[in-house]
Amino acid sequence: MPHTQPTSSLATASFSARRQQIDALRDQFTGRATAYPRADGTTGPRIYLDSAASNLRFQGAEAVVEQAMQHYANTHSHLHHGARIMTEAYAQAHDAVRQFVGAPDDYTAIFCGTGVTGGLNRMARVLSAQRPERDVVITTLMEHHANDLPHRKHMRKVVHVPLQVDPDGNAGRVDMAALQAAIQEHGDRLNYVAVTAASNVTGIANPVHDIAAAAHEVGALCVVDAAQSAAHRPIHLPGNTPNEALDVLCLSGHKIYAPGSPGVIVARKDLFAHREPEVVGGGIVEFVDAKRYDVTDTLPDREEAGTPNLPGALLLGATLRILQRVGMDAVEADEQALTQYAMSALNEIDGLTIYGSHRLEVAERIGVITLNLHDLPHGLVT
């Protein structure tokens, strides 16, 4: 969503306070002070530049988990104090996810796997089974393997839409004209459009709500991979109109400052109706005997069989609450300033290439920069 700078004096003061919180958080990453050997033989604190792959943890969120683990017990029980406390804490972690993305009551948050890969694989299976007459998926040429291969495996046909190219010959966001044409071409055979909110390679963002509106015109769904974007900018799942709402949003906790936490599916509840859960086992049944079992209708319980990753879920919930207190609009504004500064400085280096378009009209960016130096192996550049 576009960032709007606060205008009132009260809002400006609040925004300034949140900027101060961001500055304070910079010193709260676990492992930031770890010393490593340098090429010149000295040692020094590491400079972590691999957040596009996985982010470091907030110490404050770790402290919340440590406190909660004093009550550790398995969930789905109210027979003793620890079980009641952990069941409630686990439910609050789900609520934190839904609040973080602005999901309304007809959406559920399901913890699934270790990142977006598990969520996108599950949704490809679910939507293929729920809508078998719609056997086509549209995706783009800027997707991570996690948002490409599951659709190839579970759908009959996958269409890869090209990207816009700027006058310099560099790739930008998805080509919306080509996307619209593909949507209209496949019409009532189109199950869903699967698109990344922002590339994990270039950091270039896509207009996901415009894409959702285009998909909905032909009765298709919009599945968004927000693994890379969630830590960088606000997410407002409903959009500005009902037609712009995202049907499915997948997140990776380890990329939102919560390594060790689960992946998350935030999706319309009705997409899981009238079907067997993807995985069956403990915690999802109302009745079991030797001849039959009755699965609960309650979400997310019916889609989360087995003992959950409680420490990871609580870590994610605590982390998202920290980010909400700071405000993702403040995070985005601070990061945009740093990104523009970094790109300007890097562009002054002879022989250095920054991948992806630099032109804002085709390449709105988050704080991800991929670069290389001419004639040097990428490992040596690193």
Predicted regions and their residues:
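Pyridoxal 5′-phosphate
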Residues: M1-T382
